Amino acid sequence: LRPSRLAFAILSRLIVYTQPMCGIVGYIGPKSVVPVVIEGLRRLEYRGYDSAGIAVGGNPENPNALELRRASGKLKNLEAVIAVSPIHGTYGIGHTRWATHGRPTEENAHPHRDGTGTLVVVHNGIVENYLALKAALIAKGHAFQSETDTEIIAHIIQDELEQVEFENAGAPGLDSKTSARLPIPLEEAVRRAVKRLTGAFAIGVLSAHAPDTLVAARMGPPAVLGIGEGEYFLASDVPGILHHTRNIHFLQDGEVATLTKTGIALTNFDGEALPLNVQRIAWDPIQAEKAGYKHFMLKEINEQPRAVRDTTLGRVSLTTGEVFLPDMQIAPAEFQRFSGVTIAACGTSWHAGLAGKFMIERLARIPVDVDYASEYRYRDPIPDATTLGLLITQSGETADTLAAQQELIRKGSKTLAICNVVGAAITRAAQGTITTNAGPEIGVASTKAFTAQLTALFVFALYLAQRRGVITPDESLHYVTELSRIPAKLEDVLRSVDDQCSQLAKVFSTCSDFLYLGRGIHYPIALEGALKLKEISYIHAEGYPAGEMKHGPNALIDETLPVVCIATKDPADPSSVLKYEKTLSNIQEVTARSGRVIAIATEGDDAIAQLVDHVIHIPAAPELLLPILEVVPLQLLAYHIAVRRGCDVDQPRNLAKSVTVE
């Protein structure tokens, strides 16, 4: 039975919209392609995946064929398949897949072939109208071998080629099943095909009838092109090819790239030629390696002093306190007319945004709303031209955050972005960007990107306060000076608390629940600490405002429940001292019910040790900067607990680094 249009509509909306970015690596050049692609995919393992595959052309012994190998599970399984059945060539594409349509099996792994077996496709994203397309293709006689939406793309390209063949019926040598050439260039067939797709996609395409050619197209999920010395690359993210070249073109939405051994040709979906915009990436390739650490996450925790320093560098004056944001396109005078700020973000970035609310309201004296980007456009928000939108995203490609940005723009708001990737989609639509110079973050659980986001938010809060004229030069200089001291203080924290967190992990790694408490700006850090623990150790953890204990969480407390309480203070800030005193009362509520308390406290606070079971001290800092320091022991505690529990720290189950569709 053929499904009705209504069924198509319903089913197409039931697609799993949380597909993360899969890994794509393509190569064309003089080298053997298999090692290049496999190594590139390995450098993209942080994205999360459950199957892998590769297609290769250019084998001198079989020049008119594409050889394909696939395997479920990790890359080592694919390598084992290749070891048993070797393939050779000088161009090809590889893919690591996160299952959304269909099970994580070899049949559903990419690359996927068309009906002729001569064309292959890899794909990151979701084809929303794949059911309707599939039904139409089946009616034409197409047969499908997988449960995926990606296979549809290969057949759509085949369909475009066959339509041209039909139009040219009678012309010799145009049958794609037997001909050594295509009726139209491969890139033209791809351009025609992508116009029929609804959804998000970044694709790579090879055809046995278009040797030494790799075609890529993008609409939504990220894709980058690499320009080397007589060799060219395609990848879904920079680390996949950074060890070969630093010369990168970020493929834009609506672009099609044709890679050959002589260069890259770029067009839009209509075939109009476009120039390459090659950027030199400053990341050192070694930044994307473990550098001797057991896990990427531990390496990235220890890189936080540099991440904070680099995010601050060049943006503040240590002599005047002035803040400079060179990528700001909003005129300074315009900041006077904004009546409010709306922050939209997801996950860890949302926690950073919630902390940013306290920074911006305290320094710039302007109301701030913080929204989950995934909820924002569905609640009928009412921003206008007096609302400043601030989007926070590590990758710059998070689908929900991009959608929130478009909603803000649609309703007349100007938007700014805090992002870790130069040239990402979020930055291109924004009127200003603060790049978090954290470098590539490989571990799925964010660490250094979070502290860099907190730093960027603090810098922006100062910038906004200065443009609004609500902060004195002396106050600005004080805050800038204190910010400049944070990297050294982070180094102190890393040196002093790692062993202590490791010892605490021995005590608490078998617990089934954790509670994290904080007040004011420390509450978002409690949320982040709980998220880190649940992400990588699979322990249920909850963050809660300490002042809300009487409204429910007290019922959970007994001798089996560890309670992590952020009890830091800035003695020079009366409001900070008041929150600290209130927090001590909350700690006593916990201990009165036999709860076990781990306190994060400020150096010099020895009295708190009389109230709690364990104390982790961090250096003193102004109230608004303490979150950058106090999150580090929470990261390390989560890390050591996860390691003791035998969890995959860098690639937690059911999670991936970036989510590029809803």
For the regions a language model picked out, list residue spans one by one.
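Acidic/histidine-rich
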Residues: 197-231, 509-537, 567-569, 577-584
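Conserved short alpha-helical segments that host acidic/polar catalytic motifs at enzyme active sites
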Residues: 14-295, 299, 303-337, 473, ...
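N-terminal amphipathic/basic-hydrophobic helices that include classical n-h-c signal peptides
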Residues: 1-20
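Glycine-rich phosphate-binding loops that contact phosphosugars or nucleotide phosphates
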Residues: 333-485, 568-577, 581-614, 637
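Active-site phosphate/pyrophosphate-binding segments
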Residues: 304-342, 422, 432-567, 643-662
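Generic C-terminus detector
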Residues: 271, 297, 596, 621-662
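Glycine-rich oxoanion-binding loops at beta->alpha junctions
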Residues: 94-107, 319-332, 356-392, 398, ...
